[in-house]
């Protein structure tokens, strides 16, 4: 399976802005910036690339663990 992601960044580190796109369509043209690492435009918490990576790793770990447990005749 091949998946593509596009990340565009314009500007400096603290004042720049980027947009993320994923092939699956789960999100398209999603903005991210230094500010969204801590809050979004409404003052609520935002996301950041590290959080997205951690979410992907946690999801993969959970699925793999479920497969391993099933192979050992355990029902997770």
Placement of each model-derived feature along the sequence:
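Extended beta-strand/beta-hairpin segments
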Residues: 1-55, 62-76
């Amino acid at each position: 399976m091949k998946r593509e992601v596009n990340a565009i960044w314009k500007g400096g580190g603290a004042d720049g802005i980027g947009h993320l796109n994923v092939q699956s369509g789960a999100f398209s043209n999603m903005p991210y910036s230094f500010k969204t690492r801590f809050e979004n435009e409404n003052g609520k918490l935002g996301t950041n690339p590290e959080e997205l990576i951690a979410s992907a790793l946690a999801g993969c770990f959970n699925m793999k663990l479920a497969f391993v447990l099933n192979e050992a005749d355990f029902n997770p």
